[in-house]
Amino acid sequence: MTTLYSDWATESFEYDESSEACFIGDIVAFGTIFLSIFYSLVFAFGLVGNLLVVCALTSSRKPKSITDIYLLNLALSDLLFVATLPFWTHYVISEQGFHNAVCKLTTALFFIGFFGGIFFITVISIDRYMAIVLAANSINNRTVQHGVTTSLGVWAAAILVAAPQFMFTKQKGNECLGDYPEVLQDIWPVLRNTEANFLGFLLPVLIMSYCYFRIIQTLFSCKNHKKAKAIKLILLVVIVFFLFWTPYNVMIFLETLKLYGFFPNCDMKRDLRLALSVTETVAFSHCCLNPLIYAFAGQKFRRYLRHLSRKCQAVLCGRPVHVSFSPSESQRSRQESIVSSNFTHYTSDGDASLLL
């Protein structure tokens, strides 16, 4: 069994140059059951939720906004991420392992989706900061074309950042893990973990905290009946992200310290490995919540879902598909593309609930 930020294998003992063998067979057995069950659950819920987001956004004829572009790419990142989980489930419960190409490809797609999802969440917070705090100056920059260009840049960054995580991965026997050159064996795992901590958590948290803090300041300075709801939703986003990702990143940091011999005691090593498995599953399940807190909560997105539902009903019933926006919705769409005076949640959406 393996966790993604700890190259520890399926053997029942862990060996250390300065200590005796540490028995971890019971933890390996627990992890085999625990990870396989929860990987399957995360896959099922994450697949359904994010597929709904993609279908709703791509099937609507309504003009897209920069918000829609970012939500679509966030859903695609999460889909890429969860698509690898059945392979990891197979890896956890099977004794045969992967083919080398499958090992490398699965690891690559996993980390690209992993970093892509976090980067798009960060970009969404920056976009909201621009739409609300810098509303007057950002309206010309918040176009669909700008969203597409930014999204391509985010994908490129995700691939670049993910590369150190999978470039040395290969299948060795029954295990899919990092096979580092001798000169990098000591430093590369440390660099991987440090990169994950900084670029995958610390930097995004700092950016999100600053953006949403400034947004809340701006909301307090204006008069709007949706202000209280918007602030609650902002706090929900930050708190949920922090609660789901902090324990896992703490364990990655402790795993790094273990590489330097900070946990020579066998019981501490066992506890660390058990905690890493549990917190990893909690962190990964965040992709199941993204559709709920970033898309489904929005009034505009719920309209997308209603139109998608009508299309599906028409197809199932064998009726012609005629789904169009009513005049009131068309007018509302035009109004949503105008920046409100002092309180703009999205210059192209105007939807307070989308301020998540």
From Swiss-Prot:
Pfam assignment, any one: 7tm_1
Cystine bridges: 103-176
Residue ranges, Extracellular compartment? 1-26, 90-105, 169-195, 254-277
Tell me what topology the record assigns in the membrane.
Multi-pass membrane protein
Question: GO molecular function, one example?
Answer: C-C chemokine receptor activity
Which example biological process does GO assign this protein?
regulation of nitric oxide biosynthetic process
- What spans does the record annotate as topological domain Cytoplasmic, numbered to this chain? 48-68, 127-147, 217-232, 299-356
PTM-bearing positions, type Phosphothreonine: 347
- Where does it mainly reside? membrane
Q: Where in the cell is it found?
A: Cell membrane
Function recorded in the entry: Receptor for the C-X3-C chemokine fractalkine (CX3CL1) present on many early leukocyte cells; CX3CR1-CX3CL1 signaling exerts distinct functions in different tissue compartments, such as immune response, inflammation, cell adhesion and chemotaxis. CX3CR1-CX3CL1 signaling mediates cell migratory functions. Responsible for the recruitment of natural killer (NK) cells to inflamed tissues. Acts as a regulator of inflammation process leading to atherogenesis by mediating macrophage and monocyte recruitment to inflamed atherosclerotic plaques, promoting cell survival.
Q: Which family does it belong to?
A: Belongs to the G-protein coupled receptor 1 family.
Protein name per the record: CX3C chemokine receptor 1
Give the species. Oryctolagus cuniculus
